[in-house]
Amino acid sequence: MVRSRVSPGLKLQSDASNQSNDKENKLLAYVNDNRHFSLIRALHLADLITLMNGFCGVMSIFSSLRYCLSGQQSAFHLWNAMYFMPFALFFDFLDGKVARWRGKSSLMGQELDSLADLISFGVSPAVFAFCCGFQTFLDTVILSLFVLCGLTRLARFNVSVNSIPKDGSGKSQFFEGTPIPTTLSLVTVCGVCILKGKTHENLPWGEWCGNTPFAFHPLVVLFVLSGIAMTSKKLKVPKI
């Protein structure tokens, strides 16, 4: 008896084709839905949880801005900005589990997840770091590039996720580059600085090249390393 064998490459192509067809069918159903609030109707429970992730990220940004508006006198707002980010991480973990548990995903699910992650783990940590004292021109350029690295990493994930090997539950087996929520480690470093009163002019290792256009804080190099790790293609991080 002859057994047919399907190569892993062909299987991945078949899975990707099936997912593409499913996405096209969902898109057609959404475009042809002329009911009121069709956008809201298209959202699933997992999408609402993803929106909570984005909500926490936006609230973190507002809390950081409140700290700056207070004349940097009330650390209460800065701590609030920091506390919102772990809640965003909780919702980021939860939305995927709920989607797999219910066996349902919406047309916008993956895009919503990436956009929410960009706010909560890209823009929010950068604004938080700025409020902690990374405020020179070069600091802000580096923080901007850090956010762009997160944006690029998420865009790459969206276009390549179908080609990444999956486990039995349909979950990707690894990440290409560090996932963007790992940027919370940088937030933790900033939190330790706040706790020890090492912010603004008291940041560890001070300010280099002061009173020049190239002034920067050495600690901002951590954001450079994080951006490089996120955009690396050779770095494979097992997905838990």
From Swiss-Prot:
Keyword vocabulary terms for this entry: Cytoplasmic vesicle, Endoplasmic reticulum, Lipid biosynthesis, Lipid metabolism, Membrane, Phospholipid biosynthesis, Phospholipid metabolism, Transferase, Transmembrane, Transmembrane helix
Pathway given in the UniProt record: Phospholipid metabolism; phosphatidylethanolamine biosynthesis; phosphatidylethanolamine from CDP-diacylglycerol: step 1/2
Transmembrane segments: 42-62, 74-94, 127-147, 212-232
Class of enzymatic activity (EC top level): transferase
GO terms under biological process: CDP-diacylglycerol biosynthetic process; cellular response to calcium ion; cellular response to potassium ion; phosphatidylethanolamine biosynthetic process; phosphatidylserine biosynthetic process; phosphatidylserine metabolic process; plasma membrane organization
Catalytic activity, as annotated: a CDP-1,2-diacyl-sn-glycerol + L-serine = a 1,2-diacyl-sn-glycero-3-phospho-L-serine + CMP + H(+)
Pfam family, one: CDP-OH_P_transf
Localization of this protein: Endoplasmic reticulum membrane; Cytoplasmic vesicle membrane
Its membrane topology: Multi-pass membrane protein
The protein's Enzyme Commission number: 2.7.8.8
Domain of life: Eukaryota
Record-linked InterPro entries: CDP-alcohol_PTase-I (IPR050324), CDP-diaglyc--ser_O-PTrfase (IPR004533), CDP-diaglyc--ser_O-PTrfase_fun (IPR016271), CDP-OH_P_trans (IPR000462), CDP-OH_PTrfase_TM_dom (IPR043130), CDP_ALCOHOL_P_TRANSF_CS (IPR048254)
Reported function: Phosphatidylserine synthase involved in the regulation of processes such as cell morphology, cytokinesis, actin cytoskeleton, and cell wall remodeling and integrity. Also plays a role in the physiological adaptations required for stationary-phase survival.
Name the UniProt record assigns to this protein: CDP-diacylglycerol--serine O-phosphatidyltransferase
Species of origin: Schizosaccharomyces pombe (strain 972 / ATCC 24843)
Lineage: Eukaryota, Fungi, Dikarya, Ascomycota, Taphrinomycotina
Gene: pps1
